[in-house]
Amino acid sequence: MARLPTTELRKYLLTGQFTRRGCLHLRPSPLAPPIPPLRTLSTTPPTPSDQQPQIIPLRKQLKDQAKAAKLSGSPKKKLKKSDNQTVPGWDLTVGIEIHAQLNTPSKLFSPASTPSSSSDDAVHHHHPNTHVAPFDLAIPGSQPSFQPTTLIPAIRAALALNCHIEPISRFDRKHYFHWDQPSGYQITQYYHPFARSGSVTLYPRDGIAAEDGEQVTVGIKQLQMEQDTAKTLAQPNSTHYLDFNRVGVPLVEIITEPCIHRPATAAAFVRKVQMLLKSVDACTSGLEQGGLRADVNVSVKRTGEEELGTRTEIKNLSSFKAVEDAIIAERDRQIRVLEEGGRIEGETRGWSLGSMETRRLRGKEGEVDYRYMPDPDLGPVVIGGDLVERLGETMGMLPDEEVGVLMGRFGLSERDAMALMLMEGRLEYFYGVLEELERMLGVEAVEGGEQRHAMLAANWCLHELGKLAEAEEVGEAAAEEVTSQVPEQDLAAILFYLHQKKVTAKVAKDLLWDVFRGTIATGGVTEQIDSQDLWYKEITEADYAAIADEVIEGQEKVLQDFLKFKQGKSKAYPQGKLGFLVGKMMRAGPEQGKGMDPASAERVMRVRIEQVYLPRLEDAQ
């Protein structure tokens, strides 16, 4: 390791400043070539090669291996989700540990900034080993300095999970050796956590298993603050790169009671916790973005037995589906072992995307192996009741209350309300669009009813924007940031003109695409409609009738269905046939329906059929 210059050490000790280069990244010259993450560990000597092997991300390697395994195996009938929730004669018990990165500007025990708080990393690309301080790297002589601001999101998280906040908590050292923890121990709150005895209630809309009924309450044993570890980047030839930016980032560990008995309910719990933490701005990002990591403890026992079975732990599950699938796979493995007369060993297991079974990682370490002890360098954390009360008052609505508002006040379906809640940033975007739309509508927003405008805005925020993200010509990055490419004011302007019937639905969708592609500048929707003459000019009633007559000509067989209904020979009105004729009518109109209103077209078509063509058919009989 390069020696740390005394000038840099003095700056850090006296002013808390640390240079961007970091203490492991001292380059001799600004012209030096880029250097990969600097601590490289290899279990085998490198093989000389004229050509550097292509580096394939580990996640892609695992996906490719899983696909190959599926293709090589025999095809199996796909089970319904409900078929996998229970196994007759066996009881499943699951406990969950969730590690969530707290939304803080600094690390837990050093003034170094967290990667997520850095203003120059707006697109979430961070130079390796730049968000570090001497304590993060366990440099001799460096001491931990608890950063009080990290308490704020931690307390919010505990309140959102209905926990009791302990007035005094303490930090402990959890000893183990691994390359991602340079100090040889992790600082956590094993003996005296800052929050205990919480609960989360789940409902069918959260995705619980049908067997769990109308609601499930999951008990929270405790919440504890602790340090995150370095990020390990696996490379070919048993080589690992280490990025220490993540070391010391504050985490809150959420530990449940072993009270979950269905795989789908376990996944629903993790999803609900993510919603709760994000609603109070406690965590940086969600499970699939790496801000949360879930470990599950799985055990099975025969129905009727009192004592729980031996549990195994599955580490680092990175999606809600992975939580459910891994639990199902491990449950089935344990049942198979027990039915064959074997015994379950307490161990840590892993799970890969697309895999059909878990794999052994290592034997389970007991608490004695970690040698927990109070940290002598850190005093107790005292949390005042006034702070807890203040944070509770300013916390805002929690997800269940928010869903109630979306359904009751705005008239949204439960499905749409939950979709807005679950999609990253979509709920805030919806509120922004609705506020701008009602501003443009003015007094009409009150007279016309808030629900109608909210339902229109929600439909476009979910479904029409969803179509943009799913389109083949849209790249993955664009799909993830679709709301950032369609400003709230532009979508509100499109919906305003659509609501006022000044543009057709087809024109509105075309305008949305133009905004998304960037061919319309921000705030330029009205100018685009003017320049392209896209304003809706409805044709006359006589023109509607003439087009309807043109479409009906030669459709005697279709008209017979309407006649049968009129004569009582058919009980159901042929709405599908009416829609077929209206569709032909819209296509036969000027410029593919421009100037035609579908509702007016349907009304005229119905009148022409009932008042003109059916009497002719009856006379002909």
Curated annotation (Swiss-Prot):
Keyword vocabulary terms for this entry: ATP-binding, Ligase, Mitochondrion, Nucleotide-binding, Protein biosynthesis, Transit peptide
Class of enzymatic activity (EC top level): ligase
Protein's cellular compartments: Mitochondrion
UniProt GO BP: glutaminyl-tRNAGln biosynthesis via transamidation; mitochondrial translation
Coiled coil residues, start to end: none
Transit peptide: 1-41
First-listed, main subcellular location of the protein, grouped into a coarse class: mitochondrion
Pfam families the record matches: GatB_N, GatB_Yqey
UniProt EC number: 6.3.5.-
Region (Disordered) location: 26-86, 106-136
Biased composition (Low complexity): 38-57, 110-120
Entry function: Allows the formation of correctly charged Gln-tRNA(Gln) through the transamidation of misacylated Glu-tRNA(Gln) in the mitochondria. The reaction takes place in the presence of glutamine and ATP through an activated gamma-phospho-Glu-tRNA(Gln).
HAMAP family per record: GatB (MF_00121)
Sequence similarity: Belongs to the GatB/GatE family. GatB subfamily.
Protein name: Glutamyl-tRNA(Gln) amidotransferase subunit B, mitochondrial
Organism of provenance: Podospora anserina (strain S / ATCC MYA-4624 / DSM 980 / FGSC 10383) (Pleurage anserina)
